[in-house]
Amino acid sequence: MSQVYFDVEADGQPIGRVVFKLYNDIVPKTAENFRALCTGEKGFGYAGSPFHRVIPDFMLQGGDFTAGNGTGGKSIYGGKFPDENFKKHHDRPGLLSMANAGPNTNGSQFFITTVPCPWLDGKHVVFGEVVDGYDIVKKVESLGSPSGATKARIVVAKSGEL
């Protein structure tokens, strides 16, 4: 299974690294999209993009590297791609799942759960999990608000594959 990372900053100050394990065996197309966006090997990706929506006791959302506000992003496959499967459930904190605008609208936006979110099962594709740096996820979570607005500009300063 691939491992990738984000080096996260808040208002330009480094706060730490989050490492993810991707479920290549269960959702290979979804995992490959995220891996390639972490490396930037296609000429675009997550480096420099914000966590634009952070809701405490729910999730951290990012991955819009085109508009930076939740309206953009794109996949390595060109635009959106279909939901691969819903074999994994949102049953614990630290899961990596695709954000979308309805069925079969996966691009580059993702979220990291901070609680179990069973109401998202069958609607969002879980494709990985945090294996190191969950304390950094919690730091980012503390900078969010019920509306999703963040108290600092939280950015993926650097990302890549381990």
Curated annotation (Swiss-Prot):
PTM sites of type N-acetylserine: S2
Main localization category: cytoplasm
Pfam families: Pro_isomerase
Function: PPIases accelerate the folding of proteins. It catalyzes the cis-trans isomerization of proline imidic peptide bonds in oligopeptides. Involved in histone deacetylase complexes, suggesting a function in chromatin. Imports fructose-1,6-bisphosphatase (FBPase) into the intermediate vacuole import and degradation (Vid) vesicles. Regulates the meiotic gene program via the Set3C histone deacetylase complex to promote efficient sporulation, and the prolyl-isomerase activity is required for this function.
Catalytic activity entry: [protein]-peptidylproline (omega=180) = [protein]-peptidylproline (omega=0)
Cross-link (Glycyl lysine isopeptide (Lys-Gly) (interchain with G-Cter in ubiquitin)): K29, K42, K123, K139, K151, K158
More details: Present with 86000 molecules/cell in log phase SD medium.
InterPro entries associated with the record: Cyclophilin-like_dom_sf, Cyclophilin-type_PPIase, Cyclophilin-type_PPIase_CS, Cyclophilin-type_PPIase_dom
Keyword Nucleus belongs to the record: yes
Regulation of its activity: Binds cyclosporin A (CsA). CsA mediates some of its effects via an inhibitory action on PPIase.
Oligomeric form and interacting partners: Interacts with a complex composed of SIN3 and RPD3. Identified in the Set3C complex with HOS2, HST1, SNT1, SIF2, HOS4/YIL112W and SET3.
EC id: 5.2.1.8
Source species: Saccharomyces cerevisiae (strain ATCC 204508 / S288c) (Baker's yeast)
Subcellular location: Cytoplasm; Nucleus; Mitochondrion intermembrane space
Lineage: Eukaryota, Fungi, Dikarya, Ascomycota, Saccharomycotina
GO molecular function, one term: mRNA binding
Family: Belongs to the cyclophilin-type PPIase family. PPIase A subfamily.
Protein name: Peptidyl-prolyl cis-trans isomerase
Chain ranges of the PPIase cyclophilin-type domain: 5-161
Gene encoding the protein: CPR1
Residue numbers carrying Phosphothreonine: T71
Keywords assigned: Acetylation, Cytoplasm, Isomerase, Isopeptide bond, Mitochondrion, Nucleus, Phosphoprotein, Protein transport, Rotamase, Transport, Ubl conjugation
Residues recorded with modification Phosphoserine: S142, S145
One GO CC term on file: nucleus
SUPFAM superfamilies per UniProt: Cyclophilin-like (SSF50891)
Gene Ontology BP annotations: ascospore formation; cellular response to starvation; DNA damage response; negative regulation of meiotic nuclear division; positive regulation of meiotic nuclear division; protein folding; protein transport
